[in-house]
Regions:
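Conserved AAA+ ATPase small/helical "lid" subdomain
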Residues: 2-57, 62-66
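C-terminal engagement/docking regions of AAA+ P-loop ATPases
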Residues: 34, 54-171
Length: 171
């Protein structure tokens, strides 16, 4: 808007994934248990996730910033700065370990939200050659336009408490 302020809406599943990142990191054998995982990890991770969403909203001229799962990768420095690695983790590198932690956390939260939900139409769409060309800076309207062509995706989104009638940044 004219004042440059942006409303921020953090979807529940994003908050859950950020919390799960901390739990997964604490149980990851590549992360040093003696040093532990900082209790600030989820706080700084969420701050970075929200910051990336706000950056995208400002660049796109949107008035609402809504973090996406991909925004978790913008938080890599804040994640890697909150734990120390075991020898095996050192060999893989902090970024790779953090990416593994994010992937695991996303998968676990996804499984929790979509247990007993038929995801086959979405999988089939991709199996039949469906592709998306989306970047970190893709505006919400364009993201919605591209993902709207995936059969069954909006029905799945409703399980994540997303309504088809929500403004583009929220869908």
């Amino acid at each position: 808007d004219a004042t440059g302020t942006i409303d921020t809406v953090v979807p529940t599943y994003i908050s859950e994934i950020v919390e799960e990142v901390a739990f997964v990191a604490r149980s990851n054998p590549k992360i040093d248990k003696r040093s532990g995982v900082s209790q600030r990890l989820p706080i700084t991770c969420l701050e970075n996730v929200v910051s990336n969403a706000e950056r995208r909203a400002l660049a796109s001229g949107e008035t609402t910033a809504v973090p996406r799962v991909t925004d978790l990768y913008a938080a890599l420095p804040s994640i890697t700065g909150k734990f120390e690695l075991e020898y095996e983790g050192e060999l893989r590198g902090a970024d790779n370990v953090a990416r593994e932690v994010i992937r695991t956390a996303v998968g676990q939260v996804f499984d929790g939200w979509f247990t007993n939900v038929d995801t086959r139409p979405v999988i089939e769409w991709f199996d039949l050659g469906g592709t998306l060309q989306l970047g970190d800076a893709t505006p919400s309207e364009e993201l919605l336009e591209q993902t709207g062509q995936i059969q069954g995706l909006l029905e799945l989104a409703e399980h994540a408490r997303v309504k088809r009638t929500d403004p583009a940044p929220l869908v």
